[in-house]
Every structure is written in C-alpha cells, then in structure tokens.
C-alpha cells in the first residue's frame, strides 16, 4: 500500500514535471522564433517561412506576396531624439501592422527598423492595398515624444514582390521586393511600391 502511494505520488510529480517541461519547451520554442522586443517573428524564422511559402506557391499556384518595410529616416530620428524614443516608435508601429494584416500573414522584424511580411494567397495588388493602409496608419499615429523635434509624423517606405510572377526563389523575390523598396524611397518615401510599377531601377 505504502509502495503504491509512493509510486502514485511519484507519477503525479513526474506528470507535473513533464507538463512543466512541455510548457518550458513551448516558451523556449516561442522565444527561438520571435523577436523579444516586438513579439513579431524573428529573421531566422522568417527566412525559413519564406522558403516554405515559395514552394507552397509554386506547388498550388497560389500567389504569396513578400513585403519589405523600412521606417523612414529612422537613423536621423534615433540621432535626434535618442534611442529610447526610437525604440518606442518601433513598438508603436507594430500594432498598426497587426491591425492591417490578417492572422494568417507572417509578420517579422527583419532587423533594426526593417520589417518583412509574407501574405499567403494575396496578389501584389491586394498586398499593395494593405500596405497603403499601413502607410496611412503610421502617418496617423500620435507619438507625443516626436512633437518636440523635426518629425511631425512617422512614415514608412514599402516594397512588394509576389511569387511566382516576380520570382520563384528566395533571392529573386527578396531582390525584387528590395528594388521596389528602393523605388519607394526614390519617389519620396511614405509610400508602397509593387515591383514592376512605374520606374524601377
């Protein structure tokens, strides 16, 4: 009887221990794929997701749009207001992205003030429409910390490329989204450009 009790309590403890391990594993997994600062996916996860998305797109003939977004003049903003304000600006931008894009979209912080998104099933035109909403949302953000300097609002430049029409591998697609991003900056920033629109370099 005593042995049975010991075995039972040991099993219960083991059960608790295992569920802790599972929880710990889960949070470690989540930590491994997310950017601590914004809660969005990190670059490593994004790169894998992009490869998978391209394969899926080619296999099923569904469009997948890749979006690259840079916050405008972020280096200047950091220099003028300090990095703490720069950080708060990045955190203020994230809810705008989450509000505009769908739950099935993959949103990542790609580096400093650069973000990259994968929009499964969305054509370039549909992606462009969403990205214009992002530009509007960022412009309309009220960030009190910016009022004391030369930035009267936040804005972003956005480049979009769609698989399979603009590229069928990671490098092609990233290059074309980058070219579109460059075109957005050249045209005066605070806008979204779809690869192939207007004057592309």
Model-derived regions: residue spans:
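Short regulatory alpha-helical coupling segments
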Residues: 29-30, 43-63, 75, 94-102
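Heptad-repeat coiled-coil signal-transmission/dimerization helices
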Residues: 46, 50, 67, 89-90, ...
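Catalytic-core segments of nucleotide cyclases and related cyclic-nucleotide turnover enzymes
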Residues: 120, 128, 132, 148, ...
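Conserved nucleotide-binding and Mg2+-coordinating catalytic segments in signaling enzymes
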Residues: 28-48, 69-82, 91
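Alpha-helical scaffold within the catalytic cores of cyclic-nucleotide enzymes
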Residues: 94-95, 126-145, 178
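Short catalytic/binding micro-motifs of nucleotide second-messenger systems
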Residues: 99-104, 136-149, 162, 181-183
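Regulatory sensory/coupling modules that transmit signals to nucleotide-handling catalytic cores
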Residues: 1-26, 162, 196-201
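A short pre-motif secondary-structure segment
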Residues: 106-109
């Amino acid at each position: 009887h005593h042995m049975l009790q010991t075995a039972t309590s040991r099993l219960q403890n083991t059960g608790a221990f295992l569920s802790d391990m599972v929880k710990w594993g889960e949070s470690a997994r989540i930590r491994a794929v997310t950017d601590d600062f914004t809660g969005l996916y990190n670059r490593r996860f994004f790169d894998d997701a992009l490869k998978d998305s391209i394969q899926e797109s080619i296999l099923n003939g569904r469009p997948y749009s890749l979006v690259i977004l840079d916050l405008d003049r972020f280096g200047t903003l950091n220099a003028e207001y300090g990095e703490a304000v720069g950080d708060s600006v990045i955190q203020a931008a994230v809810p705008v992205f989450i509000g505009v894009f769908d739950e099935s979209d993959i949103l990542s912080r790609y580096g400093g003030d650069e973000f990259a998104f994968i929009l499964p099933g969305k054509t370039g035109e549909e992606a462009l429409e969403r990205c214009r909403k992002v530009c509007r949302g960022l412009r309309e953000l009220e960030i009190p910390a910016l009022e004391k300097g030369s930035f009267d609002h936040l804005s972003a430049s956005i480049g979009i490329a769609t698989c399979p029409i603009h590229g069928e591998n990671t490098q092609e697609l990233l290059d074309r989204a980058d070219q579109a991003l460059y075109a957005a900056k050249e045209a005066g920033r605070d806008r979204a450009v779809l690869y192939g629109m207007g004057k592309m370099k």
